[in-house]
A protein has these predicted regions:
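Glycine/threonine-rich flexible loop motifs
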Residues: 121-133
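Conserved anion/nucleotide-ligand pocket segment
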Residues: 169-242
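Glycine-rich oxoanion-binding loops at beta->alpha junctions
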Residues: 83-112
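Bacterial Sec-dependent N-terminal signal peptides
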Residues: 2-13
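Internal helical hairpin/lid segments
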Residues: 232-300
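Conserved small/polar residues in nucleotide/adenosyl-binding loops
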Residues: 1, 301
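Glycine-rich, charge-decorated loop segments at or immediately adjacent to ligand/cofactor-binding or catalytic sites
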Residues: 74-78, 148-169
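Short internal beta-strands
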Residues: 61-70, 150
Length: 301
């Protein structure tokens, strides 16, 4: 499970996430019409309140929410199309930007001055939240909208693996990054902007980053909320960048179990003594590979 005390310390001072620097955030947003790119990870840890609720309580004019893969609440299966809806608590519209539409349209941005991005990444090139960030940055550049990133630590805080080569661009590889890029989302947004990776426009994005306080690269960080349905704990987050490649095969990585991305198996006893059976498991995966078949392999728990 995730650690119950996720906060870390640098030089004996408590970490303060970008979203928790509410004095800075509200100063940037007061008097502006705001859109949010957020999900279930957009929590102010110290107060245990969602960013949307915190901003509404501060009197910020939040017009709409844009939801990435897995949706605003983070409950959708991998690849599941997310539908538009409304937040039950605030009544604010939630617009999906995962599925047919990967970025906000000019019409959807028409009544906004600024977009705020606050989503927890796990540091892997093919984790789609950073792809969503790229496309929202493109939309902001195309429509002259301000884009603000509230920064968070990267739990896989190192660089590893080959760089995505030209000609292999996709939604799980938008930018030419190594498999593990080692950047926070704020640093990555800055790099996308400065390297000219926003291909749909010659313009750069009007980018601002609300940095963390009392954090530096190398500080450990344990996520307090699972970032997506099949990354339920710290071990799965560590193993995901490696085991994810098996998803291009018919080998199960444990989707449909309580330990996804911590096991490997195939329905053949020759592959090992460890067994597991993927099933339809709400909250994890309802239609996993090798569903209802006994898989033999190994555990990395």
């Amino acid at each position: 499970l995730f650690r119950s005390t996720p906060r870390v310390y640098s030089q004996n001072a408590p970490l303060k996430l970008g979203a928790e620097r509410m004095d800075v955030v509200t100063r940037l947003l007061k008097g502006k019409r705001v859109g949010l790119v957020v999900n279930q990870t957009s929590i102010l840890e110290k107060r245990q309140i969602h960013l949307l609720d915190a901003l509404v309580a501060e009197g910020i004019d939040v017009k709409k929410v844009f939801a990435p893969e897995h949706g605003f609440r983070g409950t959708g299966d991998a690849g599941e199309e997310i539908k538009d809806s409304r937040d039950l608590k605030t009544g604010i519209p939630i617009i999906s930007i995962y599925g047919k539409n990967k970025k906000p349209s000019a019409e959807q941005l028409g009544d906004l001055d600024v977009i705020v991005f606050d989503i927890q990444d796990v540091g892997a090139r093919f984790y789609t939240y950073i792809s969503t960030m790229h496309y929202v940055m493109e939309a902001c550049a195309e429509n002259n909208k301000e884009f603000i990133v509230l920064d968070r630590p990267n739990p896989n805080d190192f660089v590893d693996g080959p760089i995505r080569q030209k000609g292999f661009e996709s939604f799980v590889g938008v930018d030419p990054l190594p498999i593990l890029h080692g950047l926070t989302v704020g640093e990555l947004a800055w790099m996308i902007n400065k390297e000219g990776w926003l291909k749909s426009t010659p313009d750069t994005c009007r980018l601002k980053i609300v940095k963390m306080e009392n954090w530096k690269h190398g500080d450990p960080y344990w996520l307090p909320v699972k970032p997506s349905p099949n990354l339920p704990n710290d071990q799965s987050i560590r193993l995901y960048p490696s085991l994810c490649f098996f998803e291009a095969t018919n080998v199960s990585v444990g989707r449909g179990t309580y330990y996804p991305f911590q096991v490997l198996g195939f329905p053949d006893p020759k592959y090992g003594d460890f067994t597991f059976t993927p099933t339809s498991l709400p909250g994890f995966d309802t239609n996993p590979l090798q569903k209802d078949k006994v898989c033999y392999g190994r555990s990395e728990e």
